[in-house]
């Protein structure tokens, strides 16, 4: 691989881990763990109510007792139960190790998932991300890191703090037959725009 692309969310104790969403119901075996049954709850993630278990309700130590599973039934299930949830630092270590084996640089392309959601929980992602990147010496445009986000304000904040490359992602509800974006709410705009009452959509970006 040229890059490893982890989606980042925050644990209860503020550690960045790689999960596609804050809700880990489908991507771990948490639903089978009786010791965590009481953690099942409903949270609003970017304007959508979701039921399940959420990373922000678990410490890193608790998350490490869980095992990852493949949520899509049509994909390979043979790795279910074999791996822990990796921290962002573990992903960076993996990239370095694999790069050394291959004799070339393997970059990391992290996405800050749901920044507004995390900020409301008191677990903002940005400074935590910057601290980890600085620990690894990744602070310049030449660093093998590209940070991406569907929101705008957090990227603007990051730009004031680091010179690493940043990418603005765009989303939509679907793609129309003519190739245009189906900008149906709540997938029509960055969530920080929605919270701020900003009328612009992803098409404006």
Language model regions located:
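Phosphate-group recognition and catalysis centered on beta-loop-alpha active-site segments
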Residues: 1-205
């Amino acid at each position: 691989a040229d890059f490893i692309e982890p989606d980042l969310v925050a644990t209860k104790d503020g550690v960045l881990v790689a999960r596609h969403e804050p809700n880990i119901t489908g991507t771990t075996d948490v639903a089978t763990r009786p010791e965590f049954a009481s953690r099942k709850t409903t949270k609003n993630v970017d304007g959508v109510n979701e039921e399940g278990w959420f990373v922000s309700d678990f410490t890193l130590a608790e998350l490490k007792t869980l095992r990852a599973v493949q949520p899509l039934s049509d994909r390979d299930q043979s790795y279910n139960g074999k791996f822990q949830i990796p921290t962002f630092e573990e992903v960076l270590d993996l990239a370095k190790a694999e790069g050394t084996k291959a004799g070339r640089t393997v970059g990391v392309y992290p996405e800050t998932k749901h920044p507004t959601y995390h900020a409301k929980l008191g677990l903002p992602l940005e400074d935590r991300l910057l601290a980890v990147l600085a620990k690894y010496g990744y602070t310049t445009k030449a660093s093998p890191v590209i940070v991406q986000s569907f929101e705008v304000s957090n990227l603007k904040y990051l730009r004031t703090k680091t010179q690493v490359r940043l990418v603005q992602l765009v989303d939509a509800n679907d793609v129309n037959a003519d190739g245009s974006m189906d900008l149906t709410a709540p997938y029509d705009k960055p969530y920080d725009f929605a919270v701020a009452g900003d009328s612009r959509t992803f098409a404006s970006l």
